[in-house]
């Protein structure tokens, strides 16, 4: 599940902080490990955060990175399979289409790493502590899939 879902978990933690609990369901697939998982991240407030990761789709599906964030005054939509890839849909008014650099999350992540080890100045995206917390969250998600229960962090 780490390779499958760590990027989703990193993003959730980066945007919303450390959850108090997780509740996950998953499917063991052809890899012999979790090949599809859905997690609800539980916070003390009223946030509703769900992330899904999987690689058992039919080959014709392709690969998609996406998110939907529903806010009080707008909805933010991103999908690597759609054009435009990123839209801001305000409650009132016309949709806004911010510029998004060409590429995908993986290529940007690799370039960031290469720049970092090459000694180029790079912006810190997450701290080592946040990286460790992402692994803690993933381990809690795995336990939740096994026990079919919420797991506290």
State where each predicted segment sits:
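A generic "alpha-helical surface" signal
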Residues: 2-3, 10, 104, 129-132
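Conserved beta-strand positions that form and line the central face of beta-propeller blades
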Residues: 21, 97, 152
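Short acidic, glycine-rich loop/turn motifs
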Residues: 41-45, 88-93
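Short amphipathic beta-strand/extended segments with alternating polar/hydrophobic composition
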Residues: 50-53, 76-80, 89, 94-103
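Active-site loop of classical SDR/Rossmann-like NAD(P)-dependent oxidoreductases
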Residues: 99-111, 126
